[in-house]
């Protein structure tokens, strides 16, 4: 503890003025916050012993006074976080995102372990690719947000996936079991009356600040405009988007959905669901920092439980929070992680709420 106090005094130039604790302030990232003693700000206090020069610079820039001990402007981050680029406010079209979103038809929820039933998560999309030999496969996921747009990861529409897997070919909605037609389930073999639909891709819009090949995968988000409007059914419905200022809580269990690899290493034919806990941002940053990856506030960490995580085929797929009235919100997009299901290593998700303005500014009727 004495060592920590020494470093605190070493970090900060002790200004000759005093400021009232709990006064309003603005962090180096421009976030409105409160000026508090350093030991009352866990996110900054825990980073005092860092050797990262940028974090040290951020700590010093966070000092907002001195009142017996350094006071700091205590926000949500301990490092500089360039805000996501958003479209001009005048171009935003929030009315194109439906209010009737995030609902699913009530059904028996569990068939076998993490299997879903056909009515669950009806916004889940499969993104298909075709290579030069006309071989087709689904390699990414996405989520329907209105009758014309899918939101997915930028790495699913650009870069390596196009070189290795093939060109973007189609989007499938309303799928449940890729091995059966029609989809039937249960002891009495209840069959889904609607077939899945395949739609063409009119346009893809990746975030302008996404850098292909970056190990940090900042701004890993993209939109796919379908070639026609979608009619909503019990098996095809849009998900809700969170507001930019809405945050999930550490320990809160969210649901990741997709057809990715199971614990056997095989891709599932049935749409899967898995509950994963939200991990503290600073703990996640420390874990991945050891591997040279810097996690930002525009990213969300969840998982880290042994043999429980999203895997390769789920890239771009949804991480969901269930709120009041059983309404689901798209909190994250599967971006990347360590080896699938490795204990202590959570998955990294693009935090969708941080990009709502960008989404609203890039969709059209």
UniProtKB/Swiss-Prot annotation:
Residues 110-364 form the Peptidase S1 domain. It holds the Pfam family CLIP. GO terms for biological process: innate immune response; proteolysis. Coiled coil: none annotated. InterPro entries: CLIP (IPR022700), CLIP_sf (IPR038565), Peptidase_S1_PA (IPR009003), Peptidase_S1_PA_chymotrypsin (IPR043504), Peptidase_S1A (IPR001314), Trypsin_dom (IPR001254), TRYPSIN_HIS (IPR018114), TRYPSIN_SER (IPR033116). Its EC number is 3.4.21.-. SMART domains: CLIP, Tryp_SPc. Residues 1-23 form the signal peptide. It is found in: Secreted. Keywords: Calcium, Disulfide bond, Glycoprotein, Hydrolase, Immunity, Innate immunity, Metal-binding, Protease, Secreted, Serine protease, Signal, Zymogen. GO terms for molecular function: calcium ion binding; endopeptidase activity; peptidase activity; serine-type endopeptidase activity. Disulfide bonds join 25-73, 35-64, 41-74, 101-240, 140-156, 184-191, 284-301, 311-340. One of its GO terms (cellular component) is extracellular space. Its main location: secreted. The active site is at 155 (charge relay system), 220 (charge relay system), 315 (charge relay system). Residues 24-74 form the Clip domain. The record marks 109-110 as: Cleavage. It is an enzyme of class 3 (hydrolase). The keyword Electron transport does not apply. Serine endopeptidase which, by cleaving prophenoloxidase PPO1 and PPO2, is required for the activation of the prophenoloxidase cascade probably following the recognition of pathogen-derived products. The clip domain consists of 35-55 residues which are 'knitted' together usually by 3 conserved disulfide bonds forming a clip-like compact structure. The clip domain is necessary for regulating the zymogen activation. Belongs to the peptidase S1 family. CLIP subfamily. This is Phenoloxidase-activating factor 1. It comes from Holotrichia diomphalia (Korean black chafer). The lineage of its organism: Eukaryota, Metazoa, Ecdysozoa, Arthropoda, Hexapoda. The gene is PPAF1.
């Amino acid at each position: 503890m004495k060592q920590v106090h020494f470093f605190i005094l070493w970090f900060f130039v002790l200004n000759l003025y005093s400021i009232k604790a709990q006064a309003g302030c603005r962090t180096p990232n421009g976030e409105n916050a409160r000026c508090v003693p350093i030991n009352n700000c866990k996110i900054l206090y825990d980073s005092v012993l860092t050797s990262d020069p940028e974090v040290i610079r951020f700590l010093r820039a966070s000092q907002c006074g001195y009142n017996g001990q350094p006071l700091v402007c205590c926000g949500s981050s301990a490092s500089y976080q360039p805000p996501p680029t958003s479209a001009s406010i005048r171009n935003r079209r929030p009315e194109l995102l439906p209010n009737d979103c995030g609902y699913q038809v009530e059904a028996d929820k569990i068939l076998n372990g993490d299997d879903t039933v056909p009515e669950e998560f009806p916004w889940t999309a499969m993104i298909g690719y075709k290579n030069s030999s006309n071989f087709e496969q689904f390699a990414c996921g996405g989520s329907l947000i209105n009758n014309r747009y899918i939101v997915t990861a930028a790495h699913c529409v650009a870069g390596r996936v196009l070189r290795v897997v093939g060109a973007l070919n189609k989007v499938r909605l309303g799928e449940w079991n890729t091995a059966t037609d029609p989809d039937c389930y249960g002891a009495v073999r209840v069959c889904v009356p609607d077939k899945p639909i395949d739609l063409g891709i009119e346009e893809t819009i990746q975030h302008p600040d996404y850098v292909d090949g970056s190990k940090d995968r900042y701004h890993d988000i993209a939109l796919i405009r379908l070639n026609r409007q979608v009619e909503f059914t019990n098996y095809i419905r849009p998900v809700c988007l969170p507001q930019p200022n809405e945050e999930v809580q550490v320990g809160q269990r969210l649901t990741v959905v997709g057809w990715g690899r199971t614990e056997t290493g095989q891709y599932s034919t049935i749409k899967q669901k898995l509950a994963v806990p939200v991990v503290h941002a600073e703990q996640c940053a420390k874990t991945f920092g050891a591997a040279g990856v810097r996690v930002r506030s525009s990213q969300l960490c969840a998982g880290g439980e042994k043999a429980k995580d999203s895997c390769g085929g789920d890239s771009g797929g949804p991480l969901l929070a269930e709120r009041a009235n059983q309404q689901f919100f798209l909190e994250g997009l599967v971006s990347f992680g360590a080896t699938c299901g490795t204990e202590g290593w959570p998955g990294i998700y693009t935090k969708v709420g941080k990009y709502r303005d960008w989404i609203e500014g890039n969709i059209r009727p």
